[in-house]
Structure formats: C-alpha cells, structure tokens
C-alpha cells in the first residue's frame, strides 16, 4: 500500500469522522498539494525518516516550487507545523493499524 492509498483511507475512515468539515477540507488541501505530490507513491513499508525529513526541509525552503527556483519563498512556520502534524497523525495511525 502506498502512502497515497493510506492517506485516502485515513481521511475517509478517521479524519472525516473526527474533524469539522472545514478542517477536513484543509487537510485534503495539504495532502493533495504538498504531501501526496512528493511522497504519495512510496510504499508505506519503504517510507523512511530520512525521506520525510528531506520532504519537510524542501517544503520549508522552497514551498511548493522546485528547488531550482530559489526566488520563491518557502512555506511559513504555521503551514509547516500543520503539514508535520497531519503527516504524523496519519503515520501514527498506520503504525497502530500494523502497516508500518
């Protein structure tokens, strides 16, 4: 199962029932535009701490832009905290589900 597949499962089973509609929509935006875009095709059992760390560092430095475009600012601390927390919640549940 890829991270993208698990994220879609997690959103439907856990997030949708535990979050307000606006929060659920915001999570969907962050997943779609940041997390799935870069990490989604990695199988859960192959996802490493280094890959997640590199992803977070890239987002912090370059935002949604390519590293070749340094003129664009990175994401703000508030957005980075949301991305980190959301990915952590999802992966923590994957561990509880016995998938990692």
Mark where each language-model region is.
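N-terminal core-binding DNA-recognition domain of tyrosine recombinases/integrases
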Residues: 8-21, 32-100
């Amino acid at each position: 199962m890829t991270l993208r597949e698990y994220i879609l499962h997690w959103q439907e089973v856990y997030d949708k029932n535990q979050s307000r509609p606006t929060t659920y929509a915001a999570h969907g935006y962050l997943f779609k535009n940041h997390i799935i875009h870069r990490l989604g095709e990695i199988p859960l059992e192959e996802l490493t701490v280094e890959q997640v760390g590199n992803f977070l560092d890239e987002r912090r430095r370059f935002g949604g832009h390519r590293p070749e475009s340094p003129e664009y600012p990175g994401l703000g601390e508030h957005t980075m905290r949301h991305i980190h927390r959301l990915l952590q919640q999802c992966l923590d549940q994957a561990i509880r589900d016995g998938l990692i």
